């Protein structure tokens, strides 16, 4: 089954995060089944966030992935703060990932993968 990919890419971490948070709000954080954060490469602070949504949120829309590029981690700054805000909007709690996990260089939080169980009742799916 084909799956759509919505890609957010920008030169401003603030704008990329704002767009991601609005789309998460629109589709509902409770409909996210997988959250993945990975570094672009081993030497970079830049990360890619992938949010995998359940199918059926709109007619003809199978599950889809929201991919956010250009956010960063590993230092105290706007990029890591925006990454933290996107994770919070996606339903990640402070207990799961603390702000310090994102802003400190020495932590091994990234790569990060969180999954939520999905239950289906007839045509309805719940994450």
Model-found features: residue ranges?
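Charged, compositionally biased non-catalytic regions
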Residues: 1-3
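Extended, alpha-helix-rich binding/interface surfaces that flank or overlap catalytic cores
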Residues: 5-8, 14-24, 127
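Generic detection of short hydrophobic beta-strand segments and adjacent strand-loop junctions
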Residues: 6, 66-68, 110
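Amphipathic alpha-helical packing elements
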Residues: 10, 17, 26, 38, ...
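Charge-dense polyanion-binding interfaces
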Residues: 95-127
């Amino acid at each position: 089954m084909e799956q759509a990919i919505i890609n957010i890419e920008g030169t401003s971490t603030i704008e990329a995060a704002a767009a991601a948070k609005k789309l998460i709000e629109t589709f509902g954080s409770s409909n996210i089944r997988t959250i993945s954060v990975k570094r672009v490469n081993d030497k970079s602070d830049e990360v890619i966030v992938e949010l995998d949504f359940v199918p059926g949120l709109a007619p003809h829309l199978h599950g889809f992935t929201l991919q956010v590029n250009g956010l960063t981690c590993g230092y105290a700054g706007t990029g890591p703060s925006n990454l933290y805000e996107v994770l919070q909007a996606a339903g990640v709690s402070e207990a799961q990932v603390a702000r310090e996990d994102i802003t400190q260089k020495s932590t091994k939080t990234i790569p990060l993968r969180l999954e939520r169980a999905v239950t289906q009742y007839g045509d309805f799916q719940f994450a």
